């Protein structure tokens, strides 16, 4: 696929670009594309685990030329269907999701930016780290009058970005909470065709998520379709959506003492509200099912559950 990045009124002059600016531009585009792909495959754009080597080819974008007429950077990249042969794309299709196999790293970058700037978008494929990368695009500008136009021979709607437009993305990014620790109990289901996407069904609702890279898949397999105690991080997205990054899974019996703290007749969220009121605090993540007040050290909790 062929793409063009046009810099209107570049300070370097038509047909020129400072090599240092080119490096910044390439770095941000690559990070946004990678984050957008990770978010579609796993549920969050950035995880603490190791990066999969097989994603390197999928994220490759080649600079094949520089032309005049302002400054025009000519780029080429392959579709994900060509570069990610082992991915079961059907596992990730649902209402409103883009056909991932037909996407390229550049189209992921363009669509992510467009979603963040579009006031009518449901922003399903955005999260705090990815928005932070978009805000970092301001580093690429050298003057207020500059503008970036990204196009794909008419196949994708042209992306138009000015430095001023990044302010609304910064506001959205700042509105999202940081990830929170979470402990919950429920039935753990593995989503079809996926080795890492899961769904936890508890008494207070359903939460989608994914397994941390540090978890042994064969060890976790014994919990499928069974009640279990799940510990990890919950990541927040625009529109109140959330995803759990599962870091540990235990037999439900090992979580009984922890969950016995609940008062009879209270659901999880009600207990959080009560305990925070007793401590004079406030619930900054009210929508999180199964989250606990936070005074317990996470490593201590793991020790209690594994004792």
Regions found by a protein language model. Name each.
Residues 151-153, 171-177, 186:
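Long amphipathic N-terminal alpha/beta scaffold segment
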Residues 214-231:
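Short nucleic-acid-contacting surface segments enriched for D/E, G, S/T with interspersed K/R
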Residues 161-181, 218-221:
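Short boundary/loop segments of OB/S1/cold-shock single-stranded nucleic-acid-binding domains
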Residues 178-194:
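Structural detector for short beta-strands of small beta-barrel domains
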Residues 235-262:
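OB-fold/S1-family single-stranded nucleic acid-binding modules
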Residues 270-307:
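Short linear interaction segments
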Residues 1-166:
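Protein-protein interaction interfaces in oligomeric scaffolds
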Residues 189-212:
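OB-fold (S1/OB) nucleic-acid-binding surfaces
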């Amino acid at each position: 696929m062929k793409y063009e990045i046009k810099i209107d009124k570049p300070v370097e002059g038509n047909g020129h670009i400072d090599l240092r600016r080119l490096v910044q531009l390439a770095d941000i585009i690559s990070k946004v594309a990678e984050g957008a792909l990770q978010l579609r495959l796993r549920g969050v754009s950035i995880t603490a685990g190791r990066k999969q080597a097989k994603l390197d080819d999928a994220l490759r974008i080649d600079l094949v030329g520089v032309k005049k007429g302002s400054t025009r950077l000519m780029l080429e990249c392959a579709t994900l269907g060509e570069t990610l042969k082992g991915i079961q794309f059907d596992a990730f299709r649902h209402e409103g999701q883009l056909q991932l196999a037909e996407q390229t790293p550049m189209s992921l970058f363009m669509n992510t930016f467009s979603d963040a700037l579009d006031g009518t978008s449901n922003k399903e494929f955005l999260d705090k780290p990815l928005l932070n990368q978009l805000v970092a695009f301001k580093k690429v500008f050298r003057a207020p009058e500059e503008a970036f136009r990204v196009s794909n021979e008419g196949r994708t709607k042209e992306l138009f970005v000015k430095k001023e437009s990044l302010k609304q993305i910064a506001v959205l990014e700042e509105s999202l909470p940081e990830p929170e620790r979470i402990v919950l109990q429920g039935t753990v289901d593995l989503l079809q065709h996926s080795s890492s996407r899961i769904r936890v069904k508890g008494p207070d609702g359903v939460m989608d998520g994914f397994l941390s890279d540090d978890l042994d898949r064969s060890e976790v397999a014994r919990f499928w379709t069974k009640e279990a105690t799940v510990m990890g991080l919950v990541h927040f997205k625009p529109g109140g959506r959330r995803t759990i990054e599962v870091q540990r899974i235990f037999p439900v019996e090992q979580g009984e003492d922890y969950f016995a703290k609940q008062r009879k007749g209270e659901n999880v969220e009600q207990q959080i509200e009560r305990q925070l009121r007793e401590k004079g605090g406030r619930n900054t993540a009210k929508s999180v099912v199964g989250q606990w007040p936070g005074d317990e050290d996470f490593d201590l909790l793991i020790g209690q559950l594994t004792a």
